[in-house]
Amino acid sequence: MYAREYRSTRPHKAIFFHLSCLTLICSAQVYAKPDMRPLGPNIADKGSVFYHFSATSFDSVDGTRHYRVWTAVPNTTAPASGYPILYMLDGNAVMDRLDDELLKQLSEKTPPVIVAVGYQTNLPFDLNSRAYDYTPAAESRKTDLHSGRFSRKSGGSNNFRQLLETRIAPKVEQGLNIDRQRRGLWGHSYGGLFVLDSWLSSSYFRSYYSASPSLGRGYDALLSRVTAVEPLQFCTKHLAIMEGSATQGDNRETHAVGVLSKIHTTLTILKDKGVNAVFWDFPNLGHGPMFNASFRQALLDISGENANYTAGCHELSH
């Protein structure tokens, strides 16, 4: 499954979007629960013809969350500029779904180092930890008034980002020839929310891949921050928002009307500012299937020649 891009008629100031297919906003009851069956051996355990793997453990500063980080390094020599590198959230599920067929495709381009940031569990997702790590504090809701998945503690994205950028990344990149101009971050759902928040808050990465970000779960205020960006501060960064078109019978769009208007305004403002951003539509894919499709697309994108994006905002200096 490949993404379909939507282009503006204005060159170098493009932001790709298709609001009729945009289904970022969903209510709690219309999301299918993730498959939480224990995982078996992954590609690191089985071995690959194209990559070799290592795993490292980390703990949060407060000692309450425990991480397992897999690093996959191509078996080919790094180019003179260094390997591209993609950090991927929900690393347990990523590693479970990564296969040698995809790694072969990557090896035919400029294969990236893959860093799958997961948790010390045999489950595909640590639901409590990711709910805290991937959500921004400013938009956190009063979860004690909610039940189910929304009763989980949230608002720890700043702490997790500091861990990722100051401890995890330096450790996994140690001894590797990395192209810092092709360093990317991918996340889905709450992970997509974290990527969008990181695009606003950090310049550590160059490419930000936000897949099906959970903006409709009380975090749509993040769009106000997006609208307020100063374009010159984002000239070195590239944002890709990835979303699946609603499938037949999917009623998520009925919950999106109010926020879709905000998204339309946000995208228009970004477009006018020349911010380097794209929207990739995945036809006929729902929220869950977007996990696989989006992480594969992000890997293929960062391994391609087009990964060295030029900033659209340079036009504003004329």
Curated annotation (Swiss-Prot):
Keywords: Cell inner membrane, Cell membrane, Hydrolase, Membrane, Serine esterase, Transmembrane, Transmembrane helix. GO terms for cellular component: plasma membrane. GO terms for molecular function: carboxylic ester hydrolase activity. The keyword Hydrolase applies. Its main location: membrane. It is found in: Cell inner membrane. Its EC number is 3.1.1.107. SUPFAM superfamilies: alpha/beta-Hydrolases. Changing D90 to A/N: Loss of activity. Changing D250N: Retains 72% of activity. Catalyzes the hydrolysis of both the apo and Fe3(+)-bound forms of enterobactin (Ent), monoglucosyl-C-Ent (MGE), diglucosyl-C-Ent (DGE) and triglucosyl-C-Ent (TGE). It prefers apo siderophores as substrates and hydrolyzes the Fe3(+)-bound siderophores very inefficiently. Tends to hydrolyze the trilactone just once to produce linearized trimers. May hydrolyze and linearize some or all of apo enterobactins while they are being exported. Monomer. Belongs to the esterase D family. This is Apo-salmochelin esterase.
